[in-house]
């Protein structure tokens, strides 16, 4: 009986020990959790209280970084000064370019006006030579026409009759020689040219003079004569007695 009682006691101790070993970790873990629970809440509260500080710090830092930087302000002022300087230089350059372009345009205008004036003068001279009665060429043509219709001139020189101006050293025939002068307020023009016909060795010198008519403004012949030899001349037209 005693042996059986001892076995029961041993068995009960073993059972109690195994249950204690099984319940001890759970008890320890629960107790640890219970003890650390305020610590967790404290950490959460600390995290909650710290978080606004972090936000404020971040906001202050952001505000501080967005504030004016002396270096950046200096660089901006330098850039503004350089931009203004460049604008002034561009304005000066543009003004000088405008002045040069204006001078160039004025020079071109002067050249164009000079060319137009020169062309107009040449055209006027050509028109005067071809159509004005005071032109030496017009006087020469009219005098040669009168010589070609004069019977005595044709009889001496033959036909066809041709006229020409002064001979040069190279044998070229120059323009008709002429001279101008004024008598009693009236302009007079003298011309001199040469004629030849079909008769060999025959050459005559034609002298003609015109005078301005005060009434019509046209030039009329005072005389036309052909010098055949130094001692012989053919009078084609003579109005000196009427005009004088």
Swiss-Prot record:
Pfam families: TIM21. It is a single-pass membrane protein. It comes from Mus musculus (Mouse). The keyword Mitochondrion applies. Residues 69-78 have a biased composition (Basic and acidic residues). Residues 1-18 form a transit peptide. It is found in: Mitochondrion membrane. Its main location: mitochondrion. Component of the TIM23 complex. Component of the MITRAC (mitochondrial translation regulation assembly intermediate of cytochrome c oxidase complex) complex, the core components of this complex being COA3/MITRAC12 and COX14. Interacts with COA3 and MT-CO1/COX1. Participates in the translocation of transit peptide-containing proteins across the mitochondrial inner membrane. Also required for assembly of mitochondrial respiratory chain complex I and complex IV as component of the MITRAC (mitochondrial translation regulation assembly intermediate of cytochrome c oxidase complex) complex. Probably shuttles between the presequence translocase and respiratory-chain assembly intermediates in a process that promotes incorporation of early nuclear-encoded subunits into these complexes. Residues 65-96 are annotated as: Disordered. The keyword Lyase does not apply. Belongs to the TIM21 family. One of its GO terms (cellular component) is TIM23 mitochondrial import inner membrane translocase complex. Keywords: Membrane, Mitochondrion, Protein transport, Transit peptide, Translocation, Transmembrane, Transmembrane helix, Transport. Disulfide bonds: none annotated. InterPro entries: Tim21 (IPR013261), Tim21_IMS_sf (IPR038552). The chain crosses the membrane at residues 107-127. One of its GO terms (biological process) is mitochondrial respiratory chain complex I assembly. This is Mitochondrial import inner membrane translocase subunit Tim21.
């Amino acid at each position: 009986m005693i042996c059986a009682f001892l076995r029961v006691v041993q068995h009960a101790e073993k059972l109690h020990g195994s249950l204690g070993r099984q319940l001890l970790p759970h008890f320890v873990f629960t107790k640890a959790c219970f003890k650390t629970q305020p610590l967790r809440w404290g950490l959460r509260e600390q995290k909650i209280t710290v978080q606004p500080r972090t936000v404020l710090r971040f906001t202050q830092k952001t505000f501080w970084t967005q504030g004016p930087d002396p270096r950046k302000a200096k660089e901006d002022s330098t850039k503004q000064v350089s931009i203004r300087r460049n604008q002034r230089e561009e304005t000066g350059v543009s003004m000088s370019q405008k002045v040069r372009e204006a001078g160039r345009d004025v020079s071109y205008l002067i050249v164009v006006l000079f060319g137009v004036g020169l062309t107009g003068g040449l055209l006027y001279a050509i028109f005067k030579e071809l159509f004005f009665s005071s032109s030496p060429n017009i006087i020469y043509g009219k005098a040669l026409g009168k010589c070609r219709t004069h019977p005595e001139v044709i009889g001496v020189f033959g036909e066809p009759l041709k006229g020409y101006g002064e001979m040069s050293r190279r044998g070229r025939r120059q323009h008709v020689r002429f001279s101008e002068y004024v008598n009693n307020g009236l302009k007079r023009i003298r011309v001199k040219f040469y004629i030849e016909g079909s008769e060999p060795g025959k050459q005559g010198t034609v002298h003609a003079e015109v005078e301005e008519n005060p009434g019509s403004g046209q030039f009329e012949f005072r005389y036309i004569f052909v010098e055949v030899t130094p001692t012989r001349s053919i009078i084609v037209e003579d109005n000196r007695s009427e005009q004088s």
